[in-house]
Amino acid sequence: MIAIVDYNMGNLASVQNAFAKIGTQTVIEGDPKKFKEYDKLILPGVGAFGDAMEHLRERGMIEAIKEFAASTKPILGICLGMQLLFESSEEFGEHEGLGLIKGKVVAFDTSKFEETLKVPHMGWNRMFTKEHPLFEGLDEEHYLYFVHSYHALCDDEKDSIGRTFYGYEFTSAVAHDNIMGIQPHPEKSHDNGLKILENFTKYRNLK
């Protein structure tokens, strides 16, 4: 069974509905003591990094998520949820993240943008992916739906499994062992997004 983490900052119903479209039952779970009962966790998120970490902290979820990760069960972060997997973010100050993937989250460097580009990065864009179980059955290059003003920088480029170009190339999907994340919204990305969610439901950690 897959749990969608409810920390009062996310598009929980739309994520759950997306899983329902592929025939997968999920539970919206707000009790961190129950996380260990599930096979997989989804960490969604919409909003500011610092607020999200505070919500997780208030609910006692930070250690529960870290313990789940240490058990080698799969975790998928979506949009802000992916960013929370990193060590820190510079969004509205410096904020500590979950530290499950080494690296940080930074603002788009608009000095590298053409005049026509704006922040946030919003709309359909291509993701170029490495071979990974999340992308099985998808082309190496496929369109997904993005809404974000900050992006991840991986300390280890091996953790970057998806790249997208918006003014410059940035990491749009990550994976380190059982920890995975995607910056775009699969629940808004039609068939390509549903395929990623389906692949996550089938994912089996190798450890």
Swiss-Prot record:
Gene3D superfamilies named among the record's database cross-references: 3.40.50.880
Location(s), subcellular: Cytoplasm
Pathway stated in the Swiss-Prot or TrEMBL entry: Amino-acid biosynthesis; L-histidine biosynthesis; L-histidine from 5-phospho-alpha-D-ribose 1-diphosphate: step 5/9
EC numbers, comma separated: 4.3.2.10, 3.5.1.2
Alphabetized InterPro entries for the sequence: Class_I_gatase-like, GATASE, Imidazole-glycPsynth_HisH
Gene Ontology MF terms: glutaminase activity; imidazoleglycerol-phosphate synthase activity; lyase activity
Active site: C79, H185, E187
One example of a Gene Ontology biological process annotation: L-histidine biosynthetic process
The Glutamine amidotransferase type-1 domain, residue ranges: 1-207
Reactions it catalyzes: 5-[(5-phospho-1-deoxy-D-ribulos-1-ylimino)methylamino]-1-(5-phospho-beta-D-ribosyl)imidazole-4-carboxamide + L-glutamine = D-erythro-1-(imidazol-4-yl)glycerol 3-phosphate + 5-amino-1-(5-phospho-beta-D-ribosyl)imidazole-4-carboxamide + L-glutamate + H(+); L-glutamine + H2O = L-glutamate + NH4(+)
Main location: cytoplasm
GO cellular component, one term: cytoplasm
Keyword annotations: Amino-acid biosynthesis, Cytoplasm, Glutamine amidotransferase, Histidine biosynthesis, Hydrolase, Lyase
PANTHER family: IMIDAZOLE GLYCEROL PHOSPHATE SYNTHASE SUBUNIT HISH
Function, as annotated: IGPS catalyzes the conversion of PRFAR and glutamine to IGP, AICAR and glutamate. The HisH subunit catalyzes the hydrolysis of glutamine to glutamate and ammonia as part of the synthesis of IGP and AICAR. The resulting ammonia molecule is channeled to the active site of HisF.
Annotated protein name in UniProt: Imidazole glycerol phosphate synthase subunit HisH
